[in-house]
Amino acid sequence: LDDDAFVVPVGGVGAPTVSLELLPSVDEASKVLDLYEKLVGRPIAAVASFEIGGGNSLMPLMAAAVRGLPVVDGDGMGRAFPEAQMMSYAIAGVKPTPALAMDYAGNTAVFETSDTTTYEHHIRAFAAAAGGMITVAEHPMSGAQIKASVVPATVSFSLKLGRLLREQRGPIDDVLPELRTLFADSVYGSVHKIFAGKVSSKNSRT
């Protein structure tokens, strides 16, 4: 990735349970990127992820597939996160805006502020007003900036982890050696078994 490349993270903001009712279309994130390019007057060279946890790990991949763009192998958190100012992009000093948000009906809003905490409050308010879930392009940066701020190799790591867990079925003790090998070569560090159990039920509230 060239240092002067224009990189834009894209993803969803809001309550994940709402997206089960307001299902995003395949090209929703790519439409946001189209609008974002018109807003800033510059073509996007690559997309990135806000967070590797949850649905936001997939939205950049969907947008990239539709647009034919590369995806940065990394994200802004290394896991899921609750607020924008907690991203490594923000911590590294990357300005959150200009940002463009779109709801399920195609209504859009543009945000401009240099303070990420203020941006977080405003973008959440728009998400709430829009029914609980929106798609956003934000934290535009150069290739040099994302190299300095991204949590690296989390996309490829997730693919390897998913493949391992899909192929290695059985007791956790049988899988642990391969898990330890995989994690040892990642940003996450070593794996420790704390307990073994089975999820029997869950209760999700929004």
Regions found by a protein language model. Name each.
Residues R163-T206:
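Oxyanion-binding "anion nests"
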Residues L39, M59-P70:
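Alpha-helix C-terminal capping segments
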Residues D4-V13, M86-F126:
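A structural-propensity feature for long, helix-poor, extended segments
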Residues A29-S30, S49-L61, G78-E83:
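Short glycine/serine/threonine-rich phosphate/pyrophosphate-binding segments
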Residues A105-V155:
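Conserved anion/nucleotide-ligand pocket segment
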Residues V66-Q85:
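Short, acidic/small-residue loops that bind anionic groups at enzyme active sites
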Residues D3-A45:
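Glycine-rich oxoanion-binding loops at beta->alpha junctions
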